[in-house]
Amino acid sequence: VFQSSGDTEVLGSMLQRWPVEEVLAELRGMFAFVWHDAETREVIAARDHFGIKPLYYSCRPDGTLILSSEIRVIRFLLDKEAKVNRRALAQFFRWGSVQAPDTILEGVHCLPPGHLLRWKEGRLEIKRWFTPKWPAQNEWISSPQDQLAAVRQGITGSVQAHLVSDVPVGV
C-alpha cells in the first residue's frame, strides 16, 4: 500500500522489485531519476526517451560522481575547477545549441536522451536503453484520411497522458 499519490513512490517500489531495464520499459512520459541501490552499492540514473528532463553528471578523478538536473549545481560544487569546454562553445556559436553528452563545462556531461548511467566503486558505464522503432515500409499509412486520424489519435493520447498530475493543471 502506497503512502502518497506521487509517482516517485511508485518508481521507487518498482526499482526495488525489478531490474532497471524492465522498469524503464514500463515508463512513459518525461523523467530523469537517480536511484541508489544500498544492497549492491550501485548508483543508477536514467533519462526519458526524448530527453525532455535534463540530467547532468561529472565523474571526478577521485571516483566521486556528481549528479544534478541543473548544471549550475554541478558548477557550484566544482567551484574553481570548472572550465569552459571550448569545443562545446564553438558548437553553440555555430549551431545555437550544445548536443549531449557535451555541455558548456569541461568534465560535465549531459546524459543523452534514452540512456542509462550506472556507477559503482568509481566505475562509470553509460548505455542506451531506448531506441525508436520505426515501422517497416509495408506498415506505412498511405491514405491521407488515415494519416490524419493517426496523428489526431497520437496527439490526443499524448496530451491526455501529460495532463495527469499531482497538482491541478490548466490549459
What are the roles of these predicted feature ranges?
Residues V1-V171:
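Cysteine-centered catalytic environments shared across enzyme families
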